[in-house]
Amino acid sequence: MTSQRVRDRLVERLRECGIQDERVLSTIRIVPRHLFIDEALALRAYEDTALPIGHGQTISQPWIVARMTEAVMQVAPKKILEIGTGSGYQSAILASLGLEVYTIERIGKLLRQARKRFRQLGIKIRSKHDDGSTGWTEHAPYNAILVTAAAPTLIDTLIEQLAIGGRLVAPVGTASEQALVQLTRTIDGSITHEILEPVTFVSLLPGMLD
């Protein structure tokens, strides 16, 4: 169930659910999601659903990946920071769109698996094993920042690493109630917020695990 027909069906579903950016849809059609999950779940790779990847983490639902990617692509970013590498799928989507991707993962085993997938696909992504809530100051500022786990509030440390004209997209809230929030730093340096969608993400946790 990794055929082009199955991928096309997923893309059509995403289009029906409101995803309009054809660059995003084309990239989701091309990037092999089945390589980012356990072989036992391969038959479900192109369903529009989140799937477990171990360590209490998930690979996000394709619609969420598309929605977040579409939101950051609206500001035409060149350099993006991702907080929470997970399986590496979202990173691969961003890199395949031609972005310079920096990604941070707190769980060492997940990051090692993701790096192996990046090498397998020939994708250049800079990655770091660290607490994502601190960002990656050495390469800041970023045109876009994408957070793939939910914190109770937007994290000031990450906002500070956002370039003028840049956009941060992140789930915000508690385990029982979350919303996808879009923050944009305007040309005059002020910050605008917009709530995009109700969502459900795993929690953004502090510290590091091997």
Swiss-Prot record:
GO cellular component: cytoplasm
Keyword Protein biosynthesis in record: no
Compartments, as annotated in UniProt: Cytoplasm
Gene Ontology terms describing biological process: methylation; protein modification process; protein repair
Pfam families the UniProt entry points to: PCMT
Keyword GTP-binding: no
Catalytic reaction annotation: [protein]-L-isoaspartate + S-adenosyl-L-methionine = [protein]-L-isoaspartate alpha-methyl ester + S-adenosyl-L-homocysteine
Gene Ontology molecular function: protein-L-isoaspartate (D-aspartate) O-methyltransferase activity
Keywords: Cytoplasm, Methyltransferase, S-adenosyl-L-methionine, Transferase
Active site (catalytic residues): S60
InterPro entries: PCMT, SAM-dependent_MTases_sf
Location (main, coarse): cytoplasm
Record-listed E.C. numbers: 2.1.1.77
Family in the record: Belongs to the methyltransferase superfamily. L-isoaspartyl/D-aspartyl protein methyltransferase family.
General function of this protein: Catalyzes the methyl esterification of L-isoaspartyl residues in peptides and proteins that result from spontaneous decomposition of normal L-aspartyl and L-asparaginyl residues. It plays a role in the repair and/or degradation of damaged proteins.
HAMAP family hit by this protein: PIMT (MF_00090)
Name of the featured protein: Protein-L-isoaspartate O-methyltransferase
Protein source organism: Xylella fastidiosa (strain M12)
